Regions:
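Alpha-helical tetratricopeptide repeat
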Residues: 1-172
Length: 172
């Protein structure tokens, strides 16, 4: 229960119908409390609206829930956990909390590097002005920059950072 509404949330998110997306996610959560796809979709809606505090709350809840309940053979759950860390890293990155962003990116990569590899070439060609960095590329870059003296660091490049994509598992 709740999978259909989670798919609706994802579709409304893609259409930038954020209120409808949140409504669909909430219906999914009424049917199945702790529906991980619905929680992730709400977080992605909040990130899209630059409501980072709300997104962070959803992601923190999801991370805590998954870390307590996930089974070793639950590939979707593992991918969702990695995506949650990656998305929390993006929030930290956008809020200029670069050390925390790096920690989240490294955690995401350690959990499931394939789940957070980023969009494929076809998706990039169709949807993005710039090639966005993958979680791995961004983690390596941040790590390199954080080693430099503060006055030499370049941690934000507005044009490129705008293209940073959120991560979600194959199926919410």
């Amino acid at each position: 229960p709740g999978d259909y509404e989670t798919e609706v949330c994802d579709m409304r998110l893609k259409d930038k119908l954020y209120d409808e997306a949140i409504q669909a996610a909430n219906v999914a959560l009424e049917k199945t409390p702790n529906h991980r796809g619905a929680i992730m979709c709400k977080a992605l809606v909040f990130i899209s609206q630059k409501m980072y505090l709300e997104a962070n709350e959803e992601l923190n809840y999801l991370i805590n829930f998954l870390e307590k309940t996930i089974e070793d053979d639950d590939r979707t759950g593992i991918g969702t956990l990695a995506a949650a860390y990656a998305n929390r890293g993006i929030i930290n990155d956008r809020n200029k909390n670069y050390e925390e962003a790096l920690q989240d990116y490294v955690k995401a990569l350690g959990i499931d590097h394939e789940a957070v590899a980023g969009p494929g070439l076809g998706t990039i060609i169709l949807n993005y002005k710039f090639k966005s960095s993958s979680v791995k590329e961004r983690a390596l870059y941040l790590n390199e920059q954080l080693q430099l003296p503060e006055d030499e660091r370049v941690l934000k490049i507005e044009k490129l950072d705008e293209g940073q994509v959120m991560h979600k598992p194959g199926k919410l």
